[in-house]
Design a protein with these regions (language model features):
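Acidic (Asp/Glu-rich) sequence patches and key acidic residues
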Residues: 1-206
Length: 206
């Protein structure tokens, strides 16, 4: 699962393969596939998006959540509550061109600030702490698995079919997992988003 952002009226920068890109884009998937053009299509797509960053931006859910939280934290005077909530769902919520440009400007201003550096460090520290915690959780789950195998005599047993007393213990241990380890955040992703927002002409969040 991920979040796909599409520029509403993206700036069209000069692209040396524009004619070929238009030709391939006009074809259906089946047509490109039958002619062996899919690899060329995706190669040109990557080049096109690099030249035209306002056309498309994607993050998987793990990267998007902390990025959008960062946007909301710094752009509360730009975004409405509806905008902020809309960024957490794949419901095609639209951020206007004016707001997109204002977001880009604001993030450019804060990206090198001490506050942002602290935000990034705290996020990295939380991730490392979560990873250490989760390593301990995995070790406990492995010990429990060995115990269950001995008790049941079944080396192929898995949590869903653990006897009740062991399933309860499994749920208790698993509940200690810290999901902060799954949500990365870094400066490069913010910069890529800034470039997209600046040239998107407004964007939809899908």
């Amino acid at each position: 699962m991920g979040f796909d952002l599409y520029g509403e009226k993206p700036i069209q920068n000069e692209f040396e393969h524009q004619e070929r890109w238009d030709e391939l884009s006009a074809m259906s998937y089946d047509e490109r596939e039958s002619k062996g053009l899919e690899d060329e299509y995706y190669t040109l797509m990557s080049k096109y998006e690099n030249v035209n960053p306002g056309a498309y931006f994607r993050n998987n859910v793990w990267w998007w959540r902390p990025l959008w939280d960062f946007v909301c934290e710094n752009c509360a005077d730009i975004l409405t509550e509806k905008d902020m909530n809309g960024g957490h769902y794949n419901d095609s919520h639209i951020i206007s061109r004016r707001k997109a440009e204002a977001i880009a400007t604001t993030l450019e201003e804060v990206i090198e600030s001490d506050e942002t550096k602290m935000w990034i460090k705290e996020h990295e520290d939380n991730m490392e702490q979560a990873k250490r915690n989760n390593a301990q959780v995995e070790a406990e789950l492995e010990e429990l698995k060995k115990l269950v195998e001995v008790e049941t005599g079944n080396p192929d047993i898995y949590p869903a079919i653990y006897p009740d007393k062991f399933k309860k213990k499994y749920d208790e241990i698993y509940g200690k997992r810290d999901w902060a380890s799954s949500y990365p955040f870094n400066k490069d992703n913010v910069i890529n988003f800034i470039n997209f927002a600046r040239q998107s002409g407004g964007f939809s969040i899908c």
